């Protein structure tokens, strides 16, 4: 299978040459990156100033003309570190042994400076500061238990998004800096913003998948939509219109957060101590740009689906907190889909048909041994597909098939990573123990309905199942389990016609089902929406 990369040819990169999972999927997914950090990193790219060659842009995505002309040039973006903001919000809740003397002293200085700016009775200033600190701590999104600078906020506003910053404790012990200012005399000596430990590159990868998808010929998109029976709307089939709708959706998402939060975060990070932000975010009086990674060019179809599904969530009328959690769930599901589909594509020499795999979904308390066995077998076959794809990707290359490299690839970005994220999403149970199998949670179901059912609309239950199968490879009923058995290469089993009755019950309990008769039901969109290219 052709293994070209986007947005530039990465074959000379050390990560590409040394890691088969990165060669297969892009740079990079990692089991160290939580689902919230995956979303935060993606939105950090969205909100940062970006440039392609000499062309800078501040929109969420490149203008369509720039996208079309984009050829063999890295994407660069200028993320902010927001160390003052993280220090103010997270230091008091961090481990005592992680609080270096310079951190504590600068925290005290920030508090003193903030008190000078507060216009209330002096006796109340300490309480006001504590209230503001607790308010920002309440937006903690990921990294609880880590050093304060490696933690992240919920991505509710642009001013709460920050790049990864790693405190280099070994360097601090060795050189013993005695002031906050000393920490920035040599870039990267005490704080690393380029280590990619927790912001491992997964968010960059998904952003690039969408950009790559928007570059595709509309005729190729339309042919794929028809062949795979995806049933996109006419607007969704035009990359330019879909891109414009995504821009509006992202703008609406960030405008939903109260302006007070943005203003408070900017004030604490930049106004109390402008020097720190200047040292971390600027280089020679210009924004400090960093290079994003790359994705596999063949994954444009997954990227296009992600763009459509994101757009439907952003234009569905959800409040900002629900939008964050829906997007987090979507990103987990998409990552799983990307791992399976790209692996299937690899093993079929690029000829895999959508969906390329099947997930046999059970009810969580399923007692039928046959249904549980098929679900378990579908999970094991998916794991095997990813396992084999990584190994086949090493064949015919100059990479030595080192067992250590393969084990790391399996754990960090391969089938073990797939299983870990699937369990984290609630798509696979039990979290521990044998006979793991696929199930649905109410949260996953609502995300599926939101991204499949037209806004302010409804579709038949049968159509709903067909579209889930087409877009996600998930099957629930006798016909779907039959297709799964065919994919598994095992004898088809005969099941009762009410195998999927539990799904109807789950939809009804969520208020998403309207019964027209005993044989016909409609699945309803859960929210009232406006704008967007949904259908």
Features from the language model and the residues they span:
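Charged, amphipathic alpha-helical stretches
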Residues: 1-124
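Generic recognition of cysteine residues
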Residues: 40, 149, 163, 211, ...
């Amino acid at each position: 299978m052709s293994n070209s990369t986007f947005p530039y040819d990465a074959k000379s990169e050390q990560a590409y040459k040394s890691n088969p999972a990165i060669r297969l999927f892009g740079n990079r997914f990692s089991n160290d990156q939580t689902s919230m950090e995956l979303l935060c990193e993606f939105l950090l790219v969205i909100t940062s100033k970006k440039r392609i060659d000499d062309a800078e842009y501040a929109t969420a995505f490149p203008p369509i003309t720039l996208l079309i002309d984009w050829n063999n040039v890295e994407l660069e973006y200028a993320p902010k570190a927001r160390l003052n903001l993280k220090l103010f919000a997270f230091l008091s809740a961090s481990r005592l042994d992680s609080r270096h003397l310079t951190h504590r002293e600068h925290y005290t200085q920030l508090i003193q400076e903030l008190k000078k700016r507060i216009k209330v009775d002096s006796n109340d200033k300490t309480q006001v500061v504590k209230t503001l600190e607790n308010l920002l701590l309440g937006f903690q999104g990921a990294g609880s238990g880590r050093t304060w600078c490696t933690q992240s906020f919920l991505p509710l506003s642009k001013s709460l998004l920050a790049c990864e910053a790693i405190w280099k404790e070994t360097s601090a012990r060795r050189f013993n800096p005695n002031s906050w200012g000393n920490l920035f005399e040599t870039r990267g000596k005490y704080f690393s913003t380029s280590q990619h430990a927790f912001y491992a590159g997964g968010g960059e990868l998904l952003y690039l998948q969408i950009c790559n998808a928007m570059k595709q010929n509309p005729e190729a998109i339309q042919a794929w939509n028809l062949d795979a029976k995806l049933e996109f709307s006419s607007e969704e089939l035009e990359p330019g219109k879909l891109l414009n709708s995504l821009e509006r959706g992202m703008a609406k998402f960030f405008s939903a957060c109260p302006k007070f939060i943005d203003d408070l975060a900017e004030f604490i990070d930049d106004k109390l101590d402008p020097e720190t932000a200047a040292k971390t975010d600027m280089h020679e009086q210009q924004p400090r740009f960093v290079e994003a990674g790359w994705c596999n060019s063949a994954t444009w179809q997954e990227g296009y689906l992600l763009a459509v599904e994101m757009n439907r969530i952003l234009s569905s009328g959800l409040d900002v907190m629900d939008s964050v959690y829906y997007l987090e769930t979507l990103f987990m599901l998409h990552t799983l889909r990307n791992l399976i589909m790209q692996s299937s594509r690899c093993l079929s020499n690029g000829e895999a048909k959508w969906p390329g795999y099947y997930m046999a979904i059970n009810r969580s308390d399923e007692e039928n041994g046959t249904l549980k066995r098929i679900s378990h077998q579908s999970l094991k076959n998916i794991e095997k597909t990813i396992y084999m794809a990584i190994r086949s990707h090493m064949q015919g290359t100059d990479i030595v098939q080192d067992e250590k490299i393969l084990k790391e690839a399996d754990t960090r970005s391969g089938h073990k990573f797939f299983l870990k994220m699937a369990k984290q999403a609630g798509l696979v149970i039990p979290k521990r123990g044998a006979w793991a199998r696929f199930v649905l949670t109410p949260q996953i179901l609502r995300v599926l309905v939101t991204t499949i059912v037209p806004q302010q609309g409804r579709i038949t239950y049968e159509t709903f199942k067909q579209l889930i199968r087409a877009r996600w490879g998930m099957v629930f009923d006798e016909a779907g389990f039959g297709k799964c058995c065919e994919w598994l290469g095992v004898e088809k089993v005969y099941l009762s016609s009410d195998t999927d009755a539990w799904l109807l019950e789950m939809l009804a309990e969520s208020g998403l089902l309207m019964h027209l008769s005993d044989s016909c039901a409609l699945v309803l969109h859960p929210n009232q929406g406006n704008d967007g290219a949904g259908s």
